[in-house]
Amino acid sequence: MFIESFKVESPNVKYTENEIESVYNYDTTELVHENRKDAGGYQWIVKPKTVQYHFKTDTRVPKLGVMLVGWGGNNGSTLTGGVIANREGISWATKDKIQQANYFGSLTQASSIRVGSFNGEEIYAPFKSLLPMVNPDDVVFGGWDISDMNLADAMTRARVFDIDLQKQLRPYMEHMVPLPGIYDPDFIAANQGSRANNVIKGTKKEQVERVIKDIREFKEKNKVDKVVVLWTGNTERYSNVVVGLNDTMENLLASLEKNESEISPSTSYALACIEENIPFINGSPQNTFVPGLIDLAIKKNSLIGGDDFKSGQTKMKSVLVDFLVGAGIKPTSIVSYNHLGNNDGMNLSAPQTFRSKEISKSNVVDDMVASNGILYEPGEHPDHVVVIKYVPYVGDSKRAMDEYTSEIFMGGTNTIVMHNTCEDSLLAAPIILDLVLLAELSTRIQLKAEEEDKFHSFHPVATILSYLTKAPLVPPGTPVVNALSKQRAMLENILRACVGLAPENNMILEYK
């Protein structure tokens, strides 16, 4: 059974005019390695423990502005057009049927959660019913692009939407023109130079100041309460992390003053957002968040998240390898081949930008391999190769082919071959939507453990967004989790805790 909404009644939950307050008992474990006489030496001891947390969620949903870096790209035009189509209730003719606008592919808008059972039947509700979230139809879009093409023409260039839909969207989008963007040809492929007719001039510091000015003016012009900025621009090459340049907050800010060339455009946008305490999310694989930038975000308590949208091939990989290792099967070789024909593929044809993507795609299985010391010796890892080629004809319809070779019982071999046609921007757009909505929501949640005196926000390095990214950014010293099921459970269970609901553990003891 599916229900649209619910309210929690519990002595541990209180609804006020502007807040939901909950008391949550977090059951976890503590491990110690102790010398035990009864065991004849050192032994691992696991001690269950319960920590009480208090959560406060501000239920006042703001008017949200979203500024995209690379607004005129395939992702930006697809997301903007998709939200307009949903807001206006647009339908259009395909070769098969009359299609209605929807938010399929969005975790927050199109997935469900289990809330319990009734008369022996499982009861589910929308994910978005857990806590008050911004309605995507109400989001105001803006942003920057190194191309001055309006969003209607950018949509036509992208060749993602059906022609009938494009015609209906054009009047809404032709007046939308991106602000000039930061352009540094040293960080992206040379083939992007032909698009760069809309750029911010000046020193690195002047560029950051211009972005700050743009954010303030966008917020004032559109009368929005909050702004979230997300990078959906070109993949950049990796920045060199150098002692004295960008290794600390002080050195990074000094490098900005000195106009150091190794400060990337994405890092410049992030600097501007942190100075304005605006959430910034990196949707590409480069190392935008150099150590000095992370230091600054932590000091300013300004939300940052990333890296790289997890939409197609990598999402499948994080599910399949988790299944194999969890089943006691040993993946020994993973070969992933992609070809695509959009501008992302064109930019990735340069070796230095491809390397950023290769790192992001390759690290996705690390935590799953490390979790099973029966299958893998220390330091052992599957052979893992990622190939990306640019084929203009296929456009935004990316092809992903994977071969997984695994060792099974008694030296046997199992091979799984998968072909995945990924409509790149149609998969990425709802993920962008989820990222900005969840980033905004997380800024309204505060918590404290029982031994703490004051409420505080989540750590500014937003691990809560991990489900949506290939290479999750985590606070220093925090384990990286890539397994998709664990990431979704973490996100859902944190939001459940905010309304005093137990984590979904699937035990269903009442029927055992």
From Swiss-Prot:
Gene3D superfamilies: NAD(P)-binding Rossmann-like Domain. It is found in: Cytoplasm, Cytosol; Nucleus. It is an enzyme of class 5 (isomerase). One of its GO terms (cellular component) is cytosol. Its EC number is 5.5.1.4. NAD(+) binds at residues 72-75, 145, 182, 192, 195, 232-235, 283-284, 308, 311, 342-344, 357, 395-396, 424-425. GO terms for molecular function: inositol-3-phosphate synthase activity. It comes from the Eukaryota. It catalyses: D-glucose 6-phosphate = 1D-myo-inositol 3-phosphate. Its cofactor is NAD(+). The keyword Heme does not apply. The keyword Nucleus applies. Its main location: cytoplasm. Belongs to the myo-inositol 1-phosphate synthase family. This is Inositol-3-phosphate synthase.
